[in-house]
Design a protein with these regions (language model features):
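ASCE P-loop NTPase motor core, strongest for the SF2 helicase catalytic module
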Residues: 1-179
Length: 179
């Protein structure tokens, strides 16, 4: 059994209320306070309590992708998670085929910024798939709208967006507009 801390529960409640209002949101706090856990709990709540099924796309730096997999297994093991990250072209094609054959076989796709922005994945991530949720971990990575990552992720078809960051926002409206 896993228990949320008080501030994490408040964060999940805020995410749920924001969803009900139809808002895209930024969850920004200091590193290590549990944004990943809050997000996983929130996606689980949407599926198992509200009946809102995915698929959801979580884009994160490679350095934390394994942590996302482990945290899903710990906090919401009933969620079907696919890790979409490989340098092997045959494996990429297999993943692409599996994902396109039946989206009901998974709830969440975890991938990296580099994989999401790669030309070989654009047909899935931005073309054929329609995502329930797009979660961008370390979302400050897309604040520069002149990057390829920003340009490609901008075209992801999704109903809602959640940006996670441990990097403080500056007093700059442009930074809030870019994501």
């Amino acid at each position: 059994k896993c228990d949320l801390r008080e501030h994490q529960l408040a964060g999940v409640n805020w995410l749920v209320q924001s969803y009900r209002r139809g808002l895209n949101v930024i969850l920004a706090d200091e590193m290590g306070l549990g944004k990943t856990v809050q997000t996983i709990t929130y996606l689980g709540y949407l599926k198992f309590v509200c009946g809102v099924h995915g698929p959801s796309l979580v884009v994160a730096p490679l350095s934390v992708l394994s942590s996302w997999v482990a945290e899903f297994a710990r906090w919401c093991p009933a969620m079907r998670v696919v890790r979409l990250h490989t340098a092997d072209n045959k494996e990429r094609e297999l993943l692409r085929t599996e994902m396109l054959s039946d989206v009901r076989t998974f709830d969440v796709v975890l991938t990296t910024y580099e994989m999401a922005a790669s030309a070989s994945m654009q047909s899935i991530i931005c073309g054929r798939m329609s995502w329930r949720y797009l979660v961008l971990d370390e979302g400050h990575r897309i604040k520069n709208e002149r990057t390829i990552q920003y340009e490609r992720l901008r075209h992801v078809r999704c109903q809602r967006k959640l940006l996670l960051t441990g990097t403080p926002l500056q007093n700059n409206m442009h930074e809030l507009w870019a994501p």
